[in-house]
Structure formats: C-alpha cells, structure tokens
C-alpha cells in the first residue's frame, strides 16, 4: 500500500485529535470529520474497527506503511512475552520516534526529515534510516552544524523536561539523549496523541501473515 500523501489536517479531523502535534490545531477551524456526511457516525463492523485502529497507529507514527506493520508483527508474534507490547515497541523505538520524543523536532514529520537528511547520530555515527531500531543504551545526538538549525533550537526551547518519557534521558545543553530502557506498553500508550487498541491491530494482522 502506497504512503498517504494527502492533507494531514484531514487525518486529524477524521480521528478528532491534533494527532500530528501541529502548533495550529486544525480542529479549531474544522472540528467535524471530513466529507459531505462527516457529522454522521455510522456503527462500524468488527472489521471496520480493526481498520480504524490500524489507521490510527499508522498516523501516530508519521503515516507508516502497511508492509511495516506486517513486518513488525511477523518479527514478534512467535516470541515469548506480551506480543502487543513488543509490536508497539517496534514503532516507539524507531529512530524518528525517539528523535521526536526527545524534543529535537516539533512533529514526527520534522523528526523524519532530520533523520533522512543526515542530521542525526547514533552512538556518534550518522544514521539516515528513520526506521532504524534504537536499543537501550544507544545515544542519540545531532551533528555539530545541525545543533544550530532553527527547527531544532525552537523545538528544544519549548521541550518541557517533565514531559520526557521515563524510558528516555535528555541533556538539552549537549543536544544528546539516550534510550535508557525498553518502554512498557502503558508508557508508550501515554505518549500517543489518541488511544489505540493494539490488541485489535494484532488480531487483524494475524489473519494477514
């Protein structure tokens, strides 16, 4: 399935939340779902609910692709432990997600650009693959020149240290952060802009693999 390239505000209105963390909340101007019949809420089937939860998760992590969901599920489904937690961890510990959570970027899309354009270092080495899986103990920092980027300095200035997830550490002065421990399911859920039923998504994906 191709990556969504349409208006991001339309996605925010669909789910009724400023899902991408934009400074100007799109719901203030148009609070209703998009479309001619946006106000009419039809009762969804179980399949429809599964699709909606899947789309919510994709949006929360910057419109990730269907094949990335399937791949993540295949990697965890046969492992011991909480499948839902391990599945969600695959996205929360992506490099672009960690860059966003640390406050180096105001939105997940800005974080994706920082990574793709080669501004981000992992353990001192450049990594430009935004899906790179960050493991506990890895340090995330920025290139020296990148520390002066306006999108970085403005974002960090507005970053409230108290909002930093417990599984991360941040040294604002050094533009450096670290994934201290693997995040728990409830910790990840608290960082998402809207509730997502991960178990329903895993059930849906179980029929696709």
From Swiss-Prot:
One of the primary rRNA binding proteins, it binds directly to 16S rRNA where it nucleates assembly of the body of the 30S subunit. The gene is rpsD. Gene3D superfamilies: Ribosomal Protein S4 Delta 41, Chain A, domain 1, RNA-binding S4 domain. InterPro entries: Ribosomal_uS4, Ribosomal_uS4_bac-type, Ribosomal_uS4_N, S4_RNA-bd, S4_RNA-bd_sf. Residues 93-154 form the S4 RNA-binding domain. Pfam families: Ribosomal_S4, S4. GO terms for biological process: ribosomal small subunit biogenesis; translation. One of its GO terms (cellular component) is small ribosomal subunit. This is Small ribosomal subunit protein uS4. One of its GO terms (molecular function) is rRNA binding. NCBIfam families: PRK05327.1, rpsD_bact. Belongs to the universal ribosomal protein uS4 family. PROSITE patterns: S4 (PS50889). The keyword Ribonucleoprotein applies. It comes from Chlamydia trachomatis serovar L2 (strain ATCC VR-902B / DSM 19102 / 434/Bu). Residues 22-45 are annotated as: Disordered. Part of the 30S ribosomal subunit. Contacts protein S5. The interaction surface between S4 and S5 is involved in control of translational fidelity. Keywords: Ribonucleoprotein, Ribosomal protein, RNA-binding, rRNA-binding. CDD domains: S4.
């Amino acid at each position: 399935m191709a990556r969504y390239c349409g208006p991001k505000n339309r996605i925010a209105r669909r789910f009724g939340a400023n899902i991408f963390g934009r400074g100007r909340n799109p719901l203030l101007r148009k609070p209703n779902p998009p479309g001619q019949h946006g106000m009419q809420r039809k009762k969804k089937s179980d399949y429809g609910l599964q699709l909606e939860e899947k789309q919510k998760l994709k949006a929360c992590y910057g419109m990730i692709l269907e094949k990335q969901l399937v791949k993540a599920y295949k990697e965890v489904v046969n492992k011991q432990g909480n499948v839902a937690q391990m599945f969600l961890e695959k996205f929360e510990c992506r490099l672009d997600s960690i860059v966003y959570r640390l406050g180096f970027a105001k939105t997940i899309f800005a974080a994706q650009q920082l990574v793709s354009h080669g501004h981000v270092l992992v353990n001192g080495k450049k990594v430009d693959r935004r899906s790179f899986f960050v493991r506990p103990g890895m340090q995330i920092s920025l290139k020296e020149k990148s520390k002066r980027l306006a999108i970085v300095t403005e974002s960090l200035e507005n970053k409230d240290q108290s909002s930093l997830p417990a599984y991360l550490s941040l040294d604002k002065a050094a533009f450096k952060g670290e994934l201290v421990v693997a995040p728990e399911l409830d910790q990840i859920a608290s960082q998402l802009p809207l509730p997502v039923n991960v178990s329903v998504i895993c059930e849906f994906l179980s029929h696709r693999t």
